[in-house]
Amino acid sequence: MIRFCSARLIQRGLHTAVAKPVMATSTAASRAAASKMAGAQAETGVVGSRLVPGYGRTLTRALGGQVLEADTEGGGHVMTEGSVDWRRSFHGLGAKPFAAPVQEELARALEPLDIEIKPDGLLYLPEIKYRRILNRAFGAGGWGLAPRSDTIVTAKLVTREYALVCHGQLVSVARGEQDYFIDTGIPTATEGCKSNALMRCCKDLGIGSELWDPVFIKKFKKEYCMERFVEHLTTKKKKKIWLRKDREVEYPYK
């Protein structure tokens, strides 16, 4: 509750002055105002007299219910005559096979040194190796990933659909996904989402197809991999992990 004290007349010699009303604030009102100010600081990110935009706001509130990347339709995107809108088009899908040299490069067996294995025993090809194979087959600039949807951000996941276009024709469409743990990790997760979509699209070209062949997987593990009991340095828990025979146990295991 706010009270206003009555004005007082002050006589000083020949002059008369009117004192301004004095505003007195009750203790309860002071506490309420302080609480409101603290809430505003947490919301807007005010630190002392500085305003730090964006801090203290949740991702959901910051996006305002919108997706991370807005649809470009009608937003200044101009399609020239003869161009293809890869967000919707299936231009060239299954229209014609690639030249024989391209197919030979795509079907080439993977080098054993290029294949990695995860601690749980899953074989995989690093994402950069997929890009190198595409560059050898189609040439640098002869292929690309075109987004087919908006970037969807959930509480723990980033996902987006991409199309792989090679020599002007659609080859494959796949949805990439990537987990994240804090809001500042979203930009990195969007790149991981793109890499995941690239790997899935390359399956339709036959790149690294042996990684899904049970016979090859068993043979590769027997020749190039081994299982070892290790201890986690932090939790001190012991477990069995897979690793290549030419590799050493790395952190966080010993």
Swiss-Prot record:
Principal subcellular localisation of the protein: mitochondrion
InterPro entries the UniProt entry points to: Mgm101
Signal peptide positions on this chain: none
Transit peptide interval: 1-32
Location(s), subcellular: Mitochondrion matrix, Mitochondrion nucleoid
GO cellular component term, pick one: mitochondrial nucleoid
Any Pfam family hit: Mgm101p
GO MF annotations in UniProt: DNA binding; single-stranded DNA binding
Domain of life of the organism encoding this protein: Eukaryota
UniProt keyword annotation of Metal-binding present: no
A GO BP entry: interstrand cross-link repair
Record's keyword terms, sorted: DNA damage, DNA repair, DNA-binding, Mitochondrion, Mitochondrion nucleoid, Transit peptide
Function: Performs an essential function in the repair of oxidatively damaged mtDNA that is required for the maintenance of the mitochondrial genome. Binds to DNA.
Family recorded in the similarity comment: Belongs to the MGM101 family.
Name by which UniProt lists this protein: Mitochondrial genome maintenance protein MGM101
UniProt gene name: MGM101
